[in-house]
């Protein structure tokens, strides 16, 4: 926690500034973890690394988190909820009736949110195979986002803007799973992958074509 120059100047001589609060320490641990994940996987990061980076002792670390895996779970939970809240805001305040822009805005929520936290995204995806908590967190929100997508597809069909082709929920599932794999491959620079600068346009094209195209 920092204090402004003005508040520091008003402190009596010889007094120490306030110690970091519990919230500050927790945030410091989370920030340290995200920074370290930029350079190496969670398996190569120790609790001592996290404690040292946060400016606390190892015993103090365990006051806030039971393990480094719990730190990752918290980081991923924050990113996932950030994306979910942004999508909820869009759903409650629709700003564009153009169908391509409507879907672009929604997909961009995930592109921007997860793209701003690539290290956490990579670590979270890797942890799904070994962490029940991470897998459940991701599954819960994917199901929520798929249900929302299906509801929008149904609404577009009900107003006559989109044809009734594949079942909406199945189409929404395939599109969201495609987003997940394609975005994360681009963020990680995998080969093959769509270049990050073009991945949003690519996904929007596929979504619009799939939702509004007729069966052949």
UniProtKB/Swiss-Prot annotation:
Residues 23-83 form the HTH tetR-type domain. Inhibited by tert-butyl 4-(3-thiophen-2-yl-1,2,4-oxadiazol-5-yl) piperidine-1-carboxylate (RF1) and 1-(thiophen-2-ylacetyl)-4-(3-thiophen-2-yl-1,2,4-oxadiazol-5-yl)piperidine (RF3). The record marks 176, 179 as: Inhibitor-binding. GO terms for cellular component: cytosol. Residues 46-65 bind DNA. Residues 1-24 are annotated as: Disordered. SUPFAM superfamilies: Homeodomain-like (SSF46689), Tetracyclin repressor-like, C-terminal domain (SSF48498). Binding of inhibitors to EthR induces a conformational change in this repressor, which is then unable to bind its DNA operator, consequently allowing for increased transcription of EthA and bioactivation of ethionamide (ETH). This is HTH-type transcriptional regulator EthR. It comes from Mycobacterium tuberculosis (strain ATCC 25618 / H37Rv). The lineage of its organism: Bacteria, Bacillati, Actinomycetota, Actinomycetes, Mycobacteriales.
């Amino acid at each position: 926690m920092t204090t402004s120059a003005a508040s520091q100047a008003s402190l009596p001589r010889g007094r120490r500034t306030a110690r970091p609060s519990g919230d500050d320490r927790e945030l410091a641990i989370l920030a340290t973890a995200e920074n370290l994940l930029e350079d190496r996987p969670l398996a190569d990061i120790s609790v001592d690394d996290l404690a040292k980076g946060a400016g606390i002792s190892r015993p103090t670390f365990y006051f806030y988190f039971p393990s480094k895996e719990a730190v990752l779970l918290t980081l991923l939970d924050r990113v996932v909820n950030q994306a979910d809240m942004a999508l909820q805001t869009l759903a409650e305040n629709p700003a564009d009736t153009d169908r391509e822009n409507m879907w672009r805005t929604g997909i961009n929520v995930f592109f921007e949110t997860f793209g701003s936290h690539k290290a956490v995204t990579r670590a979270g995806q890797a942890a799904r195979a070994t962490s029940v908590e991470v897998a459940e967190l991701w599954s819960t929100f994917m199901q929520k986002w798929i249900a929302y997508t299906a509801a929008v597809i149904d609404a577009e069909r009900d107003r006559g803007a989109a044809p009734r082709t594949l079942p909406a929920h199945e189409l929404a599932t395939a599109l969201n799973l495609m987003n997940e794999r394609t975005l994360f491959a681009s963020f990680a620079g995998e080969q093959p992958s769509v270049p990050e600068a073009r991945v949003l346009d690519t996904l929007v094209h596929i979504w619009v074509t799939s939702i509004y195209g007729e069966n052949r």
